[in-house]
Amino acid sequence: MNLEAYFPVLLFIIIGVGLGLALMTIGRILGPNNPDPDKLSPYECGFEAFEDARMKFDVRYYLIAILFILFDLETAFLFPWGVALRDIGWPGFFAMGVFLLEFLVGFVYIWKKGALDWE
């Protein structure tokens, strides 16, 4: 097995990691270090922090985030399918139809369960 072809990749990784570490070290050494209470306090839209950071968080935000990720992934699958539709033909068309139908059924289900109601 000829490993000489991988030498440029190894060199690229070594230079990238070395340059990154060198720049972080130079920034740490030469950068100003003047900690004070204002700089060390958490920033909350220009106001003082109201409550502890470990307060309870409404689960609906998580639900909306998960739904966003699911439909974002659906969109990510739709683009390459649209580009390759001419090559994959009717079997690919029907496979994507089943995929979209599953998402539609899931969307109707969460809609009927009230997951999208913000009351």
Curated annotation (Swiss-Prot):
<dbReference type="InterPro" id="IPR023043">
    <property type="entry name" value="NAD(P)H_OxRDtase_bac/plastid"/>
</dbReference>
<dbReference type="InterPro" id="IPR000440">
    <property type="entry name" value="NADH_UbQ/plastoQ_OxRdtase_su3"/>
</dbReference>
<keyword id="KW-0830">Ubiquinone</keyword>
<feature type="transmembrane region" description="Helical">
    <location>
        <begin position="7"/>
        <end position="27"/>
    </location>
</feature>
<keyword id="KW-1133">Transmembrane helix</keyword>
<dbReference type="GO" id="GO:0050136">
    <property type="term" value="F:NADH:ubiquinone reductase (non-electrogenic) activity"/>
</dbReference>
<dbReference type="InterPro" id="IPR038430">
    <property type="entry name" value="NDAH_ubi_oxred_su3_sf"/>
</dbReference>
<dbReference type="GO" id="GO:0030964">
    <property type="term" value="C:NADH dehydrogenase complex"/>
</dbReference>
<comment type="subunit">
    <text>NDH-1 is composed of 14 different subunits. Subunits NuoA, H, J, K, L, M, N constitute the membrane sector of the complex.</text>
</comment>
<keyword id="KW-0874">Quinone</keyword>
<dbReference type="GO" id="GO:0048038">
    <property type="term" value="F:quinone binding"/>
</dbReference>
<feature type="transmembrane region" description="Helical">
    <location>
        <begin position="88"/>
        <end position="108"/>
    </location>
</feature>
<keyword id="KW-0520">NAD</keyword>
<keyword id="KW-0472">Membrane</keyword>
<keyword id="KW-1003">Cell membrane</keyword>
<dbReference type="GO" id="GO:0008137">
    <property type="term" value="F:NADH dehydrogenase (ubiquinone) activity"/>
</dbReference>
<protein>
    <recommendedName>
        <fullName>NADH-quinone oxidoreductase subunit A</fullName>
        <ecNumber>7.1.1.-</ecNumber>
    </recommendedName>
</protein>
<keyword id="KW-1278">Translocase</keyword>
<dbReference type="Pfam" id="PF00507">
    <property type="entry name" value="Oxidored_q4"/>
</dbReference>
<keyword id="KW-0997">Cell inner membrane</keyword>
<keyword id="KW-0813">Transport</keyword>
<comment type="function">
    <text>NDH-1 shuttles electrons from NADH, via FMN and iron-sulfur (Fe-S) centers, to quinones in the respiratory chain. The immediate electron acceptor for the enzyme in this species is believed to be ubiquinone. Couples the redox reaction to proton translocation (for every two electrons transferred, four hydrogen ions are translocated across the cytoplasmic membrane), and thus conserves the redox energy in a proton gradient.</text>
</comment>
<comment type="similarity">
    <text>Belongs to the complex I subunit 3 family.</text>
</comment>
<keyword id="KW-0812">Transmembrane</keyword>
<dbReference type="GO" id="GO:0005886">
    <property type="term" value="C:plasma membrane"/>
</dbReference>
<feature type="transmembrane region" description="Helical">
    <location>
        <begin position="63"/>
        <end position="83"/>
    </location>
</feature>
